[in-house]
């Protein structure tokens, strides 16, 4: 069996056609590569999502924090950890709320899923985790997929994975909030979703004046 790197155009999760590199060995490996490409967003959309969480301003997004569950000591610790995460991500959430990019609503839904988590153990186990850009992209892709896939790894820091095991209604609500990138054949470009100023009609002088 050959193990050559092959580049080919492939349809991505966002509906865009992107050049992908396929390098897995054998026919089953090639199939796995194709399925992975189909289950992830294109490079341009990945960069769009990353830009959305970069350089937040000084704003803050109000979040209703649920009561944490666990032993008293764990709850106290988890509260501090969750508050630290909120201070870090709150300004980003405020920025997302103001953005017309359809991906912004999906990213905001991801963060809101995160802060709905009530398990003290989750916050403690992930106390060193930064919920960075790569995490955001993975979470948005989880929301966008019509069904689970075995070609993408799961991890314990995922809010999507947590709620898939605890309460699917939370995921359903997040998908509804992110419908602009889910219920579409192709995700619109960021510029296409931005409101444009109405054009003023050019009026010729009236002959009656």
Regions inferred by a protein language model and the residue ranges of each:
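Charged, low-complexity intrinsically disordered segments and flexible loops
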Residues: 23-209
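Short acidic, Pro/Gly- and aromatic-enriched capping/linker segments at domain boundaries
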Residues: 1-11, 66
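Cys/His-enriched microdomains
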Residues: 8-13, 40-43
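Intrinsically disordered, low-complexity regions enriched for glutamine and histidine
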Residues: 1, 14, 198-200
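Cys/His-rich metal-chelating microdomains
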Residues: 13, 17, 45-48
């Amino acid at each position: 069996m050959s193990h050559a790197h092959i580049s080919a155009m492939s349809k991505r999760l966002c509906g865009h056609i992107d050049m992908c590199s396929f390098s897995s060995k054998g026919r089953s490996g090639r199939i796995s590569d194709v399925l992975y490409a189909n289950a992830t967003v294109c490079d341009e959309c990945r960069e769009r999502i990353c830009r959305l969480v970069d350089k937040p301003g000084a704003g803050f997004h109000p979040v209703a924090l649920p009561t944490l569950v666990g032993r008293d000591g764990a709850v106290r610790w988890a509260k501090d950890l969750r508050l630290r995460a909120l201070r870090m991500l709150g300004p980003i959430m405020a920025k997302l709320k103001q953005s017309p990019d359809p991906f912004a609503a999906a990213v905001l839904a991801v963060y809101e899923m995160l802060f709905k988590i009530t398990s003290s153990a989750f916050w403690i186990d992930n106390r060193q985790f930064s919920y960075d850009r790569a995490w955001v992209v993975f979470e948005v892709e989880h929301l966008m997929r019509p069904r689970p896939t075995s070609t993408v790894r799961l991890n314990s820091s995922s809010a999507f994975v947590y709620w898939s095991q605890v309460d699917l209604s939370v995921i359903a609500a997040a998908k509804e909030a992110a419908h602009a990138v889910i219920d579409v054949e192709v995700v619109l470009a960021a510029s296409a979703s931005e409101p444009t100023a109405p054009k003023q009609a050019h009026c010729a002088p009236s002959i009656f004046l």
